[in-house]
Amino acid sequence: YVTATASFGGKSGKTVESDRFLIYEEGAFDLMPRIAQHYGVELNTILADMRMQDCLTRQGNRIFIREPKNTTAYSSGVLSEYYKAIIDGLLLGRAENCEFGYEPVNLNTGNFYMEQTDATIADIGGDFALTRQYNAKGAAYEGSLGFGWTFAYDERMGELADGSVLWLRNNGGIITFTPAGEGYLAPAGCDYELSETENGYVVEILDDGSRHEFDSFGLLRAVEDSCGNRTELAYDVDLYLKSITTPSGKEFRIALDEKNRLSSITLPDGHGVTYTYDEAGNLAQVTNPAGGVVRYVYDDSHRMTAWYDENGHRVVANEYDGEGRV
């Protein structure tokens, strides 16, 4: 807080104190409602004090938090070292410029990358699948499925201090769009177009005609294919995903555990997928709608060392070098 005392002619008046406040420096993928929730203040109070026109955070911006009820530093837990690693290159995830061989190993980087499907149903425009991806070189990232994993709809938009816009993709990679005139440029070789809307951003995938729509918080709200079939996402008041609705209107309901990780997904037919975590925060096992259990084992750095199928057979055994390469 700030104190001030008026003085005139050698005489001092009453000393007054300002409201207590703190200054928070934004990260590229922070969410304003969660910052407000952490410090125990109303989101509208922050927006009014800062005269903010939208809620999309920008790396390096400083936010004035008036009368915080909690003064411990906020950390979104998003990206950290993982974020820095991806910004250095686009070789995490199954990108266009990556060569894979043997198991799902990126031969450019030695990164172990794996995609698995938990459930599939028939729907308009083709099968609708619940998928998740694992990146060993992204094991420092703790997301909605523990360390190293991303969910199919874990997509976000964020901004850097220089005005670049980041697209955090569902395969664990990041695409950086750089400002160019009144628009943005995608990296060379990437067939994407980014446009700004009244409500946020839209990314168009030129090779298949699909589009990904993001709101003013940078959260994914809808995916639409070239035929206009839309998958829509809904969030709770704290901006955690609560449901996914397919083009035909079928709903997948999301449940979270006490640490806001995916606990279960209930399918339209009432069956479900459950997710269990070990004490270190790793995704330890997944139980599919048929009752089959897949197990995962990790080292102390959250890198997957083995996984076992529904029959208990070990499918993969990984060893890593000092650089985290398989």
Predicted features by range, described:
Residues 116, 130-131, 177-179, 195-197, ...:
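Aromatic-rich beta-strand edge motifs centered on tyrosine
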Residues 5-12:
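Short, solvent-exposed loop/turn segments at the edges of extracellular beta-sandwich modules
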Residues 186-209:
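Extended, loop-rich substrate-binding clefts of extracytoplasmic carbohydrate-active enzymes
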Residues 5, 42-77:
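Extracellular LysM carbohydrate-binding repeats and other cell-envelope/extracellular binding modules
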Residues 69-191, 309-326:
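Short secondary-structure "cap/edge" segments that initiate or terminate local elements
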Residues 15-44, 61:
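Primarily a LysM-type cell-wall glycan-binding module
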Residues 169-171, 205-208, 216, 222-228, ...:
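Beta-turn initiation residues at beta-strand->coil junctions
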